[in-house]
From Swiss-Prot:
It comes from Arabidopsis thaliana (Mouse-ear cress). There is a cross-link at G76, G152 (Glycyl lysine isopeptide (Gly-Lys) (interchain with K-? in acceptor proteins)). This is Ubiquitin-NEDD8-like protein RUB2. Belongs to the ubiquitin family. Residues 153-154 form a propeptide. PROSITE patterns: UBIQUITIN_1, UBIQUITIN_2. Gene3D superfamilies: Phosphatidylinositol 3-kinase Catalytic Subunit, Chain A, domain 1. Keywords: Cytoplasm, Isopeptide bond, Nucleus, Repeat, Ubl conjugation pathway. InterPro entries: Nedd8-like, Ubiquitin-like_dom, Ubiquitin-like_domsf, Ubiquitin_CS, Ubiquitin_dom, Ubiquitin_ubiquitin-like.
Length: 154
């Protein structure tokens, strides 16, 4: 099937894909056509950033759908947040982002309110007002998400 990828400059790229193709595959096809490295590509559909390991079918992307391509400038950092179920959520951050901002990004993707999130990195619980840089969180870092149960103090 054919899908379209629209860039911020307004250019539209036509791609031949299968619904079983992963977002990784689509980014590789964009690289073949446009020379843009996959790690600088962000694909958006229906207002959501598409995750690399998912397929077009996972996002209900059908023939003649239009994806939007946003380029990620170097300096942005891709980290992962791992849940207790083992699910990994990819989040694009800046070193100056606060932990609270990272929790907001987790909420955007997973619907978990920041107040219920505890983020752990290098064995430490992260304080909301500190930045990624304060904890030396960099590209490829994996944070662990633990949910704080509702209720009073123990």
């Amino acid at each position: 099937m054919q899908i379209f990828v629209k860039t911020l400059t307004g250019k539209t790229i036509t791609l031949e894909v299968e619904s079983s193709d992963t977002i990784d595959n689509v980014k590789a096809k964009i690289q073949d056509k446009e020379g843009i490295p996959p790690d600088q590509q962000r694909l958006i559909f229906a207002g959501k950033q598409l995750e690399d390991g998912r397929t077009l079918a996972d996002y209900n992307i059908q023939k003649e759908s239009t994806l939007h391509l946003v380029l990620r400038l170097r300096g942005g950092t891709m980290i992962k947040v791992k849940t207790l179920t083992g699910k990994e959520i990819e989040i694009d951050i800046e070193p100056t982002d606060t932990i609270d901002r990272i929790k907001e990004r987790v909420e955007e993707k997973e619907g978990i309110p920041p107040v219920q999130q505890r983020l752990i990195y290098a064995g430490k619980q992260l304080a909301d007002d500190k930045t990624a840089k304060d904890y030396a969180i960099e590209g490829g870092s994996v944070l662990h998400l633990v949910l704080a149960l509702r209720g009073g103090l123990l």
